Amino acid sequence: MERNFETVMIEQCAPVLASLKPAGLFRYETRDCADLARRVKNWNTQLNPKGLRVRVLKGCVLNHRYLVYVYRESKLAAVLADEKVQSFLRNEGYRLPEAGEAPDAGNMLTQLSRKLCCSAEFPHEIGVFLGYPLGDVVGFIENRGKNFTCCGCWKSYGDPDAAQKHFDQLSKCTAVYLRLFHSGTPILRLAVAA
């Protein structure tokens, strides 16, 4: 089957659609920027009632590659409301509201997008925005991707058994969603309302 926008979205973001993760990210290649904009707008129209949003975080018209972010606004807001996450993001250069105020997810994603587009170094704190445990994100940064205890959907630096169990759950979800999608179940039916 052709790896069109929808296929790649299922491959990379099934756990987000199933409400097992707050967010997912995939690379999409197209020479037709207008078509990509239409697809993002169309999917937002369809998925917003289920609590999902689609956004292009980074795009390059020279190589026609785009990073598309699919997320559950309420789950991302919960991640960003965590004081430890906020402290970590402040240390990574993010502007957040005063203590006690909830950060605006859209504003935080705009800051992440700027870092993706303008920073010389890849912003590994993106793991927080993808719902990876803070300890794993910090562990990855401090260890430069080495010395992990388990590797699956991301590199884990905590309990390897718990991490593997979680990775297995996410992989099973993706396999089931791909099977259903390839059997004709539309994405809108696969997306769980939150």
Ranges and model annotations:
Residues 39-101:
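A glycine-rich, hydrophobic loop/mini-helix early in the fold
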Residues 1-50, 54:
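A structured, charge-rich N-terminal accessory region that forms the first stable segment of a protein
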Residues 93-124:
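Internal catalytic-core helix/loop-beta-alpha segment
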Residues 153-194:
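Long, compositionally biased
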Residues 21-23, 64-66, 123-125:
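Short, surface-exposed beta-edge/turn micro-motifs
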Residues 96-97, 117, 138, 150-165:
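Non-catalytic, substrate/partner-engaging modules appended to enzymatic cores
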Residues 122-150:
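Hydrophobic/aromatic-rich, well-ordered segments within soluble, folded domains that form packed cores
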Residues 103-107, 141-144, 151-158:
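Short linear loop/turn motifs
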